[in-house]
């Protein structure tokens, strides 16, 4: 049994993404916690080492704020680039935290949001393939489709991590904690 823990502000944690079959998908080596509660974790990272399931590694190119919620089946990465804020949204299980890392199951579907507010649903073919290969239940499919709709509403309504104030507040908090 995994003992859950809530990460504390200023703490540095790993983020571990898994696939439905239990295999590790991707690991971010360092994310600084900006807010940690039972329901929401907000973190920041910059030039962070990422390790893929096949052991390949790469380093993130820009500062990012990450948003996880315990009641929604998605997480959001807000990436700060020269031409504006891009969002990469992963359809995923709600997060859990233990002493090792923040963890979630990646369910393939992604939404990319551009600085102008336009967005695209990505990886539908990968989702269909993995749904068959890993036997996603019909319940999970319904939950994920519902959360795609919720996520699209949040994007269109500029709610949660898509709100301009969210970006301003949490980017400043990250800079302060990291002494930028």
Swiss-Prot record:
Role summary: Has nucleoside phosphatase activity towards nucleoside triphosphates and nucleoside diphosphates.
UniProt keyword NAD, yes or no: no
Chain positions recorded as Mg(2+) 2 binding sites: 108, 110, 123, 126
Residue numbers binding Mg(2+) 1: 90, 106, 110
Enzyme Commission (EC) number: 3.6.1.15, 3.6.1.6
Entry protein name: Nucleoside triphosphate/diphosphate phosphatase
Cofactor dependence: Mg(2+)
Organism: Staphylococcus saprophyticus subsp. saprophyticus (strain ATCC 15305 / DSM 20229 / NCIMB 8711 / NCTC 7292 / S-41)
Family label: Belongs to the Ntdp family.
Record lineage: Bacteria, Bacillati, Bacillota, Bacilli, Bacillales
Residue positions of the active site: 26 (proton donor)
Catalytic activity entry: a ribonucleoside 5'-triphosphate + H2O = a ribonucleoside 5'-diphosphate + phosphate + H(+); a ribonucleoside 5'-diphosphate + H2O = a ribonucleoside 5'-phosphate + phosphate + H(+)
A GO molecular-function descriptor: nucleoside diphosphate phosphatase activity
InterPro entries referenced in this protein's UniProt entry, alphabetically: DUF402, FomD-like_sf, Ntdp-like, SA1684
Alphabetic keyword roster: Hydrolase, Magnesium, Metal-binding
First-tier enzyme category under EC: hydrolase
